[in-house]
């Protein structure tokens, strides 16, 4: 599939995603994960934060979200997002020792809809309450920000956790992600879990496989065909050929049903058939009893430009709590 064909598919997916907003059930919750690319990166280029920040906020509003996690949010970006998205509450300390410096992985939630019963940030380490602590060979300090939310209309509760796991140590990714899941079980006291993030791994690697034993990848739980691209990280550029998520899920035809059970089951000679489709490292996981109505990788470019609001695409899911 050539670039122009892929772009057609990506754009064609957008009306499907947003038209559904008007007809989705009243108790449905739209969640997302979005790595927004840290502000010090790409200075003096068309992808600088100052050049793209307004388009990023516009895309967040267009997605019509109820709760979402972001990654690589620096202090200046956090200030801007708080100011420009006043309808959302922002929860998440930065990962520096003072809790105010370096990147954050915050959770946003719509204030008119939810009440936060519990919230916080902890570090992905053997001493999670110690700011800037590191374990398991991690290259950077890493955090999880979380909430226990109650829907004001239905009274239903759920945990929302968001993180950006290490890009070097696979052990740190696995240990950190399992720490998050166990803590959400504890904090939520049995409430369903939504777990988002840039996990810096493919779904066939140990960290994702470990989490998949407890939670479910929302992509494979979707009751409708996913829309948008397979890859979520594009690094500001595309390859000559791209594949949509729907096409990827048909390769081979049995892969979708198989992966609902065990992603490792489809490996051939140690390789997963999806590996050729590019890096899909941004995730939404949900508890097994959470329904997923739809799932999308949102490929919107900045208006009038062949540029994007971030070097990652956001991923979204519309869910219904049990």
For each predicted feature, which ranges?
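N-terminal export leaders
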Residues: 3-7
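Active-site metal-binding loops of divalent metal-dependent hydrolases
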Residues: 36, 163-165, 198-199, 313
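Metal-dependent phosphoester-hydrolase catalytic domains
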Residues: 171, 184-193, 201-322
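Active-site neighborhood of phospho(di)ester-bond hydrolases with catalytic His/Asp-centered motifs
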Residues: 69-71, 93, 194-198, 218-220
């Amino acid at each position: 599939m050539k670039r122009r064909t892929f772009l057609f598919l990506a754009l064609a997916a957008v009306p499907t995603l947003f038209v559904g907003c008007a007809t989705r059930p009243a108790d449905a919750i739209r969640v997302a994960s979005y790595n927004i690319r840290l502000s010090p990166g790409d200075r003096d280029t068309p992808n600088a934060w100052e050049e793209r920040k307004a388009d990023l906020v516009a895309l967040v509003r267009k997605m019509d979200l109820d709760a979402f996690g972001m990654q690589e949010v620096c202090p200046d970006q956090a200030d801007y997002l708080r100011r420009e998205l006043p309808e959302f509450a922002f929860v998440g300390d930065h990962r520096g020792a003072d809790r105010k410096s370096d990147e954050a992985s915050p959770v946003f939630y719509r204030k008119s809809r939810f009440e936060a019963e519990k919230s916080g940030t902890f570090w992905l380490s053997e001493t999670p309450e110690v700011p800037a602590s590191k374990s398991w060979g991690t290259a950077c300090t890493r955090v999880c920000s979380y909430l226990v939310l109650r829907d004001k209309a239905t009274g239903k509760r759920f945990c929302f956790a968001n993180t950006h796991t290490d890009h070097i140590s696979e052990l740190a990714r696995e240990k950190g992600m399992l720490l998050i899941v166990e803590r959400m079980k504890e904090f939520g006291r049995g409430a369903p879990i939504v777990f988002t993030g840039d996990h810096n791994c493919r779904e066939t690697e140990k960290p994702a496989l470990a989490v998949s034993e407890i939670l479910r990848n929302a992509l494979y739980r979707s009751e409708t065909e996913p829309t948008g691209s397979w890859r979520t990280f594009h690094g500001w550029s595309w390859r000559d050929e791209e594949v949509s998520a729907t096409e990827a899920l048909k390769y081979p035809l049995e892969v979708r049903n198989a992966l609902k059970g065990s992603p490792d089951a489809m490996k051939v000679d140690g390789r997963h058939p999806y590996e050729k489709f590019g890096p899909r490292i941004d995730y939404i996981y949900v508890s097994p009893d959470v329904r997923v109505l739809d799932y999308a990788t949102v490929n919107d470019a900045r208006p009038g430009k062949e540029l994007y609001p971030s070097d990652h695409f956001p991923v979204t899911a519309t869910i219904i709590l049990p």
